[in-house]
């Protein structure tokens, strides 16, 4: 039986979580959230959830386990869920090395859905998330983008995506694009 492992990728504020929530709600696919390891470690170390601490922990985890760290940490959960479901959605796969790890494991069953939004749209969304993960200003936003692209090799998975959805409109447009992608699997 064919398996569908879909990674939703994109820059911060592009709409990855909105896309993932939609797939969870409409299709009932189980989710593996790569960022869970970061939040678990923040809690273990008693650190506040903010951009600086998240970055510190991500770098620490990657220093310990390599650039494919989050994929390595997620693989046991993915394997377990694939015993129960033929479809899984992966949220927040970042690095090229993570992409290669999952691609090597699952081959053609693994697909990437990139969500793209302009920097201005993403900044506005992130400013509206102030309670979740505060962002101070546009300069911090640009620094965060640079760090994610250069420090986590984030561009690779976005560049090789099987489908790119432009998320500049409303949620109905985003949902329609996701439905079209899933129909073609």
Please report, for each region that a protein language model flagged, where it lies by residue.
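Small-molecule kinase domains that catalyze NTP-dependent phosphoryl transfer to phosphate-bearing small molecules
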Residues: 68, 131-177, 181-184
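Conserved phosphate-donor/acceptor-positioning beta-strand/loop module used by diverse small-molecule
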Residues: 91-92, 105-129
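Short, well-ordered beta-strand core segments
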Residues: 31, 112, 163-166
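Hydrophobic positions on the alpha1 helix immediately C-terminal to the Walker A/P-loop
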Residues: 19
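ATP-dependent small-molecule kinase phosphotransfer cores
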Residues: 30, 34-89, 93-104, 120
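P-loop (Walker A) phosphate-binding loop of NTP-binding proteins
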Residues: 11
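Conserved lysine of the Walker
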Residues: 16
């Amino acid at each position: 039986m064919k398996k569908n492992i879909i990674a939703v990728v994109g820059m911060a504020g592009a709409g990855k979580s909105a896309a993932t929530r939609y797939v969870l709600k409409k299709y009932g696919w189980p989710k593996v959230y790569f960022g869970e390891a970061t939040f678990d470690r923040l809690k273990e170390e008693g650190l506040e959830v903010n951009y600086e601490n998240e970055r510190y922990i991500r770098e620490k985890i990657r220093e310990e386990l390599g650039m494919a760290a989050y994929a390595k940490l997620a693989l046991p959960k993915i394997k377990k869920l694939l015993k129960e479901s033929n479809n899984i959605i992966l949220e927040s796969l970042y690095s090229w090395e993570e992409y290669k790890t999952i691609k090597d494991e699952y081959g053609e069953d693994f697909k990437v859905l990139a969500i793209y939004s302009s920097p201005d749209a993403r900044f506005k969304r992130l400013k509206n998330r102030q309670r979740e993960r505060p962002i101070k200003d546009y300069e911090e936003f640009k620094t965060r983008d640079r760090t994610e692209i250069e420090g986590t090799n984030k561009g690779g998975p976005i560049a090789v995506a099987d489908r790119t959805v432009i998320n500049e409109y409303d949620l109905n447009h985003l949902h329609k694009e996701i439905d079209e992608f899933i129909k073609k699997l």
